[in-house]
Each structure stands twice: as C-alpha cells, then as structure tokens.
Design a protein with these regions (language model features):
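Alpha-helical scaffolding within the catalytic cores
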Residues: 14-23, 84-97, 114-125
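Aromatic-lined carbohydrate-binding surfaces of glycoside hydrolases
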Residues: 1-17, 33, 37-46, 85-87, ...
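Active-site groove signature of glycoside hydrolases
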Residues: 18-57, 176-181
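Structural preference for beta-strand elements that scaffold enzyme active sites
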Residues: 28-35, 75-81, 103-106, 130-136, ...
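Substrate-binding cleft of secreted/luminal carbohydrate-active enzymes
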Residues: 108-118, 123-191
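Aromatic-lined carbohydrate-recognition surfaces of secreted/lumenal glycan-active proteins
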Residues: 1-6, 57-91, 131-142, 181-182
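An active-site-proximal structural segment forming one wall of the substrate-binding cleft
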Residues: 7-35, 63-66, 94-98, 160-173
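Aromatic- and acid-rich polysaccharide-binding/catalytic face
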Residues: 31-32, 38-42, 90-120
C-alpha cells in the first residue's frame, strides 16, 4: 500500500516511531537505520506495463524519496529492499531510487543462474552514487512462496552460498557490497 502513498504519510509515521524510540535511548543503544520492503510488483497496476505501471512506480519512488529525506532528518539510515528486475523493467526508477532515495539497496538475488549479471547494474549504480548494496540470499525450502530449487540455497548448503559470495566479492571489487540471508529461521536450521 505504501507504493500508492506518494506523500509517504504511513511510512514516515513508522520511521518516526523508530526515531522517537532512539531519542529515549543512550547513544550506544540506538537503532541505526531502517530497511523498507515495498513491493509494487505484487500490485495489479504492475501488470499494466504501458498504462498503469509508470504511475505506480512514480508514486513508489516519490514515497521512497520522502521516507529517505525524513529518515535523514531523524539521523537514521534508510535502505530499500528491491527485486533483481528493476534494472530491466524500470531502469530510470532504479537509478533515481539509488541516487536520491536511500543510503543503500538490498537486492533480493533469488536466482542462482547468474547472480553476478542479475545485480551488476545495481552494484554499478551503488558504486556511482556512493551507496551500499546488500546481496540477499534465499534460504527457504523450495515450494514455499512459489520458490523453486533455483531460487534458494536451502538444498545447496551454506558452503555453496559462501562460495558464491566470495565469487561476487572478487567480481565486483566494491567495498560497499555486503551479504545477507533471508531469513533467520531457515539459517538456524542449516547451521
């Protein structure tokens, strides 16, 4: 729903809760930032490429930018979780998002076929604009949330995932690149 809210009123209220919490905490106990995972590609308007998608994505971008500005005012980092396909489906939105809408992006790199190419543009933009980028690996079992075997490391194991991360670090050579797992429960089961 936040994708519809170009004024970012609801998003800003959530950020405000975190910022208000921080004001009551000693410096060392404060929350450093927030990550937003707004998924406009799950909405009906996304399917209407020519007619409705551009307006939806502009509203999404404006919401993100408003949230970023507010988070910065409240001394919070602001990261945005994105899929691997914005570079091909809406490249101008992706660039504006990285340039003007976040401190960093977290790319849901949930397809093992070509993990480098799937996030090459995102890393290129992050590097160009001095932003961070996180490569998120999926760990849930195939069959959950329409995941297929190729989307997850659940059956390949953590060693294969770590080899992938090492390879991406070497290929990208970008100090702003980090890695994360989706999510804690399946990670615990794999350890």
């Amino acid at each position: 729903e936040w994708a519809y809210d170009a004024q970012a009123e609801s998003l800003i209220k959530r950020i405000e809760r975190v910022a208000d919490y921080n004001e009551r905490q000693p410096q060392g106990s404060r929350i450093r930032g927030v990550m937003v995972d707004i998924e406009p590609y799950l909405l009906e308007e996304w399917k209407e490429k020519e007619t409705q998608r551009p307006g939806l994505m502009q509203s999404y971008l404006t919401c993100i930018q408003q949230g970023y500005r507010y988070a910065a005012q409240r001394d919070l980092e602001f990261w945005v979780c994105i899929p691997i396909f914005y570079d091909t489906s809406c490249p101008d939105i992706l660039e504006a998002l990285v340039r003007d809408g976040c401190d960093g992006i977290a790319v849901m790199n949930y397809n093992r076929t070509d993990e480098y190419a799937q996030m090459a543009k995102e890393v290129e933009l992050a590097r160009a604009y001095g932003k961070g980028v996180i490569c998120i690996y999926e760990l849930q079992q195939p069959g959950k949330h329409d995941l297929e075997e190729i989307n997850t490391y659940a059956n390949q194991g953590l060693e294969a995932l770590w080899q992938s991360a090492e390879g991406l670090e070497k290929q990208f050579q970008y100090d702003g690149l980090r890695f994360a797992y989706h999510y804690y429960q399946p990670l615990r089961q794999m350890l």
